[in-house]
Amino acid sequence: MLISLVLTICAVASAQQVYVSTSGPLDPPSCTAIYVSSNILPSYHHSQFSYTQTETVRTAISAQPFPTETYGPPFSEMSHLLPALSTTSWGNWDPAATSTPTDEADPYGQAAYSALWQAASVRNFTRGIYSTTVAPTPVPKAELVVPPPLYFTPAGCYSFPCDFMLGIDSAAAQVEGAVADEGRTPAAPDFLVEFARSIGADTSDMEDDFIATENYYLYKQDIERLASVGIKYYSFNIAWSRILPFAVPGTPVNKQALAHYDDLINFAIEKGVRPVVTLTHFDTPAQFIGGNATGLSRRPLLGYLNLGYQNETFEDAFVHYGKIVMAHFANRVSIWITFNEPLTGVDTGPSVDHIIKSHARLYHFYMDELKGTGKVSIKMGAAPALPQVPSNASHIAATKHYNDLNIGTFLNPLALGQDFPDAYKQTIQDYVPLTQDDQAYLNHTLGVSYPTLALQRHFI
């Protein structure tokens, strides 16, 4: 019975599959169709027919190198804006090493570098398989076939404007690995898994950042693949504890780290990918949280994790680090992010004070001293809330409180040049007041990036 049924169907319909090769993005929808309902009832009948099913096999268009653009003078012309800097290099730290450094007299030598790692007491330290930069390999065309479009899509016509900056984002702690290589010293993310275990959290889906995806050595492979699928913007963060292993002003700059990020930026530009640089993405050097996982156990008053922003040395140290990086790369980087989601690491009132003032100092350094023509901003992590029930007065009040506390704390001074909102001053008792001069200096130094929205019905 099954065989005869199949034969009957084959006799009624014949089909042909045709593949059409093309490349590049789909044309945006014209959005001219108007939906009109109809009361006409369909009629059905049977007949023989044939059809051709055409499927477009679309391949991505690689990013194309763009004309040479500069956004400020080269470092050779800007070095006078920085204090006298010494540069050096360090080896790797290996807990299983059988020999120990002998340069104990050097406060910033290999022995001092190793001592920072020993004091960190990281557990289950592991190392990746790479120890040098891997040369990129081309991506086969067969791997660049774009998935077919969805059959069922939203009725509305949505498309990005031509100047919309769509790209890929990463963080050093999430992708680099090589955490103890070429002079990098411990940073807050190195202790996250250990900290989670210490408070009884489920760590089954967590991994230490010791290896990650080994982007530190595979960055050329990664950028080659981003460019191959047409990505035009790559946002990454430079690891502070690589550039300045001892974190604070007056300590040596790691010339290997500068060379690494210099090459990363140059290679991205060569491939037609514009670099977007973040100065810190939760990876505060461990010195600001006490040097080990214990510092993470401090319960923040407003944020989610102690990232050392409240440390009295943080502001000047971060500005010093930021100036070094900006002065070296401002001629090739058009977009700078000082902090990624600053609210996450807010511990106390001084945390907020140090964040907004160090950001503003770097903004003015870039605009007024470097004469940069790019953009400087912060990536906000707190999404604006909406009332769950728009007509409910308590939901509206809760929404205003949430937005004022989590967003207005930064936007009031940095975007509007205004004082902190009452919700912040009433919640954080040790907040640092802003003078009129502070508000004027902070004003208009912030752009905003929101990933989502929140619905609010209770005060938090």
Region spans (language model):
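Fungal secretory targeting signals
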Residues: 1-17
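Active-site region of glycoside hydrolase catalytic domains
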Residues: 16-163, 167-170, 174-196, 248, ...
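Catalytic domains of carbohydrate-active enzymes, especially glycoside hydrolases
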Residues: 164, 217-239, 264, 274, ...
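Aromatic- and Gly/Pro-rich amphipathic surface segment
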Residues: 187-224
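Surface-exposed beta-strand-to-loop junctions
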Residues: 200-201, 235, 344-347
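Chitinase-like catalytic core of GlcNAc-active glycosidases
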Residues: 202, 212-215, 240, 246, ...
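Glycine-rich anion/phosphate-binding loops
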Residues: 208-220, 251-263, 310-324
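Aromatic-lined carbohydrate-binding/catalytic grooves of carbohydrate-active enzymes
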Residues: 229-257, 273, 277-287
